[in-house]
Regions:
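Polybasic low-complexity intrinsically disordered regions
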Residues: 1-75, 135-136, 147
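Short glycine/serine/threonine-biased micro-segments
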Residues: 14, 46, 107, 128-129
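Aromatic-acidic/polar surface patches that form glycan- and anion
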Residues: 17, 124-127
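Hydrophobic (often cysteine-bearing) scaffold residues that line and stabilize catalytic clefts
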Residues: 20, 24, 100, 130
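Juxtamembrane/interface motifs at transmembrane-helix termini
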Residues: 30-31, 80, 130-131
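Short amphipathic alpha-helical segments enriched in hydrophobics
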Residues: 31, 35, 115, 141-142
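Helix-centered, glycine/charged polyanion-binding patches within enzymatic domains
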Residues: 36-121
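C-terminal domain-tail junction helix/linker
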Residues: 126-147
Length: 147
């Protein structure tokens, strides 16, 4: 999870074949429970790609009152339209806000400039996670020293 300054705020390491969507809510819980942030669920705006577009994820984010901007997948749009008026209205989607998602991609791009993170040479997950956290800490300190 990254913030508007391209700094990683929460990290969760998963196997390569694991999907992104099941990790979203635990990652959000880690972020909100951390000492790093003092924002509440009402102050968070979650930007995600279509991988996080599952109806159960949207339902849980609404239940937690987390604002989110996630585009619908093509199959979801087609299914909703096939149901006609019983399909409900489409979820709110603001293109201008969604364009800010590039900060997330830039944060991961900056992180992958570190050779150990980009190439994943480490045999053990804990060692790799340590490298990710070290690189992230150094990136945050460099950003803070510039300001």
């Amino acid at each position: 999870m990254a913030d508007a300054a391209c700094d990683l705020d929460a990290v969760r390491l998963t196997p390569g074949q694991a999907g992104d969507n099941p990790q979203l809510l635990p990652l959000l819980d880690d972020y909100l429970a951390s000492d790093y942030t003092d924002v509440g669920p009402l102050d968070v705006r979650l930007l995600g790609d279509k991988a996080y577009s599952h109806p159960s994820t949207r339902r849980e984010l609404r239940r937690r009152r987390v604002k989110h901007t996630i585009p619908e997948r093509r199959d979801q749009i087609a299914n909703r339209k096939a149901k006609g008026s019983a399909g409900g209205r489409p979820p709110a989607f603001d293109v201008k806000i969604y364009q800010l998602r590039n900060t997330i991609e830039r944060a991961f791009g900056r992180l992958k400039q570190w050779r150990g993170v980009a190439t994943r040479y480490d045999k053990y997950a804990l060692t790799f996670l340590g490298g990710v956290l070290l690189a992230s800490t150094i990136m945050i300190s460099r950003t803070a020293s510039r300001n």
